Amino acid sequence: MTHPNTATPPFIAVVPARLASTRLPNKPLADIGGKPMVVRVAERARESGAQQVLVASDAQAVLDAARDHGFEAVLTRADHPSGTDRLAEVAAQFGWSDDTIVVNVQGDEPLIDPALVCGVASHLAASHGCAIATAAHPITDPAEIFNPNVVKVVLDARGVALYFSRAPIPWARDAYQPHWPNVASMPAPHAPAVVHRHIGLYAYRAQFLRTYPSLAISPIEQVEALEQLRAMWHGERIAVLVTHEVPLPGVDTPADLARVQALFGS
């Protein structure tokens, strides 16, 4: 992984988890090797070196599971539309200073690399003028470029996000146009048309989290169904840490859960 040239700053990891999941009910409590999924995620967050790990949920059962395994847990409202909104409530409850770095470790990522969690926190600390940091990796499979479930990000010369999209960006005109619309025959991306896949891991400055709930939803956020575009619409800059290690997938479906359970010997 590409790490920033800075010592790891103090940071807080928050694991937002909710029971309401249409594809996998009670997902945070799913058993993985004898422990609930949310606990597996919190353990990975702890391994990242975070000075504090919090589980945030609107479900008492999730809070109890976290506390039973020694993790701090905080009750949040049930009406949050996103994990970022849940983090914003936690930031308000704890009253963290403006420059406190808070990493959102999604509650369905039991295989997340602790080094990546630490990496985005360090990258934000080194990215002055940015309120948010996230991560991405180069795409090598042409099929992923044209998959709308794979979010792409275009970076500027400083590694700051220019745009996130489900569309194939940047569009390599000379390489793709002769094959369009036959996606199966598209060539693999190559320099200078490097395509980056966004990794859904975020570090925030607490000051931004306090302002986030007051930001109006943006048209591009609604069209793309990507909440990070709200911050960009309102002028916030997002620093992107590029890693060449492809992260292991999270758990969205029963099949995903079975795959992860097998890795833990469940």
UniProtKB/Swiss-Prot annotation:
Location(s) in or outside the cell: Cytoplasm
Principal location class: cytoplasm
Transmembrane segments: none
EC number: 2.7.7.38
CDD domains registered for this protein in UniProt: CMP-KDO-Synthetase
GO biological process terms on file: CMP-keto-3-deoxy-D-manno-octulosonic acid biosynthetic process; lipopolysaccharide biosynthetic process
Role: Activates KDO (a required 8-carbon sugar) for incorporation into bacterial lipopolysaccharide in Gram-negative bacteria.
Family membership noted in the UniProt record: Belongs to the KdsB family.
Protein name (Swiss-Prot/TrEMBL): 3-deoxy-manno-octulosonate cytidylyltransferase 1
Top-level taxonomy: Bacteria, Pseudomonadati, Pseudomonadota, Betaproteobacteria, Burkholderiales
